[in-house]
Amino acid sequence: MKTKKPIKPYYRFNNEVLKSLDENWTRASDHAKILTVDNQKTIKGAKYGYKTLGIHFAPFTLSGQNICPWASKGCAAACLNTAGRGIFESIQKARIKKTQDFQTNRNKFLARLYREISNEIRAAEKAKIKLAFRLNLTSDLQFEKIALNHKSEQSIIHTFKDIQFYD
């Protein structure tokens, strides 16, 4: 009989982690998902056995604030914001809302992102698949320098140190 390998503690969304997150945290099910799966930028990893998830923000100043502070002119010209389903108004509105949520209530946004990543890790372990995350699908943010919350200097990327993140 096989024994189940326990999930590593920093993958769990337990009371200790909840206490360290924003007090105004709300359940992820109350909002649209932050992470996107299966788009033109992420499906390429599937042939290598990876399920890749990422975040689509409204790039540049589409949300009212610049989410691509380090983007080059070439990046702006080649931006895939309106590629595929991005052409639809409802998708653009969702990306703008997601970007505004990130800018106005970062602690709550990052708490929701933490929960989504934790859930994906548990599902991937159960399904025995590999995960990768690309948090800058249509943005140019330094997630490795953004603290998970106001009580921690650790970023979301450093919290999940055994998971593949790429830009």
What does each of the following model-derived ranges do?
Residues M1-Y166:
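Class I S-adenosyl-L-methionine
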